[in-house]
Amino acid sequence: MHNPQHYMTGFGNEFATEAVAGSLPVGQNSPQRVAHGLYAEQLSGTAFTAPRGENRRSWLYRIRPAAVHGRFSLIEQSRLHNDFGGGPVPPDQMRWSPLPLPATPTDFVDGLYTMAGNGSPEAMTGVAVHLYAANASMHGRFFYNADGELLLVPQLGRLRVCTELGVLELEPQQVGVIPRGVRFRVELLDSAARGYVCENFGGLLRLPDLGPIGANGLANPRDFETPRAAFEQRDGAFELVAKFQGDLWRADIDHSPLDVVAWHGNYAPYRYDLRRFNTIGSISFDHPDPSIFTVLTSPSDTHGTANMDFAIFPPRWLVAQHTFRPPWFHRNVASEFMGLVHGVYDAKAEGFAPGGASLHNCMSGHGPDAATFDKASQADLTRPDVIAETMAFMFETRAVLRPTQQALSAAHRQADYQQCWSGLRAAFQHPPAKNTTSVLR
């Protein structure tokens, strides 16, 4: 693709970029004749009438319009879908070892594997959670998702995501967001790649409100990076793959759709380095709620309740006094899907490996394992706990995450996960009877 890789900084900004000078019209969006023989095309990510502060759209100036391709036909496959219904959902806590890497050549699209989800794209609420494992770049094919925006969380291997609006290079401990409808190709920069994907059907991801934290903190807007315009002009026999209403569809296309020479607007891919997250924590006592670790949030129609929150558990110092410092035992009205990008998660001493995943659905008890509890209960609190070399994350949703059948029956599901709490014994010592006010019998 033409143009060396550079980025523009800021979250949700109104950007303007061109790979060929003079391609952007001045003072209007759709001139009678666009410079250099390009076509003008608007890409809308929200309704035309959405409030200005929430309105997302970009104008693209491209070699051919997006409408130029063949007729779509259904791809028969069962790994990637929106089928979260039919059948009971067990309330068990669940954990999976890393998704095995493929033994045969597999690109990003073929390597997607649906784990769980809720809601639907037609209802414009909910999410789908996928894993990916690939060992080949996408050759001669391009992909777009009409169902939702994609939050990519690499765990193994670097990715070069070539999109209509420019190139995102991602490595583990960075995340990327591909807006709904944007066409792209994923190239592997290493021999294999694995990671996590949250497909957001609901309100577009945004930065959380900071409240009393103030004007700064958590993920700062200036650290988000959006690519500058880059394009390729290639003719040939290519394949365009679309995810639409939970199914994959393919169409022939005789040129690369990554042919946007210039664009302006605020609906575009972006990336963020999780190592730049400004972590907030207690410097007195107790462990604050994990909402303090929110990087991005998708709002719902209920004020104060997210459709989905993306939170991380990065390196940090724990200094709270008179306090059990690891994450506490918890039952949550929300549902939590966790993954581990790097290192060890401080609430699980064993069994939760990078590339692995866990699901704690609504009101399923969870928390530190027995080894972590015993260690933290006896820790010397005069010294800080330096949590280093780690990066865990969570997709938290207001609706139950319904695991797919392939996730429930997967060979890499850990059937003995509940045993991590089996060592938590009753240590209660009954005080003298005179100090007891009420006992159930």
UniProtKB/Swiss-Prot annotation:
Keyword Iron attributed: yes
Q: Which cofactor does it need?
A: Fe cation
Choose any GO biological process term that the UniProt entry carries and state it. Answer: L-phenylalanine catabolic process
Per the Swiss-Prot or TrEMBL record, the active site comprises 287
Pfam annotation, one family: HgmA_N
Keywords in alphabetical order:
Dioxygenase, Iron, Metal-binding, Oxidoreductase, Phenylalanine catabolism, Tyrosine catabolism
Q: Which reaction does it catalyse?
A: homogentisate + O2 = 4-maleylacetoacetate + H(+)
Enzyme Commission number:
1.13.11.5
- Signal peptide (UniProt feature, chain positions): none
Q: Name one GO molecular function term.
A: homogentisate 1,2-dioxygenase activity
| InterPro entries the record matches | HgmA_C (IPR046451), HgmA_N (IPR046452), Homogentis_dOase (IPR005708), Homogentis_dOase_bac (IPR022950), RmlC-like_jellyroll (IPR014710), RmlC_Cupin_sf (IPR011051)
Q: What class of enzyme is it?
A: oxidoreductase
Pathway involvement?
Amino-acid degradation; L-phenylalanine degradation; acetoacetate and fumarate from L-phenylalanine: step 4/6
Could you tell me the superkingdom of the organism this chain comes from? Bacteria
Could you say which residues bind Fe cation here? 330, 336, 366
Record keyword Metal-binding present: yes
What family classification does the UniProt entry report for this protein? Belongs to the homogentisate dioxygenase family.
Q: How does it assemble?
A: Hexamer; dimer of trimers.
Enumerate the NCBIfam families for this protein.
hmgA
Q: What is this protein called?
A: Homogentisate 1,2-dioxygenase
Organism of provenance: Xanthomonas oryzae pv. oryzae (strain KACC10331 / KXO85)
- Gene that specifies this protein: hmgA
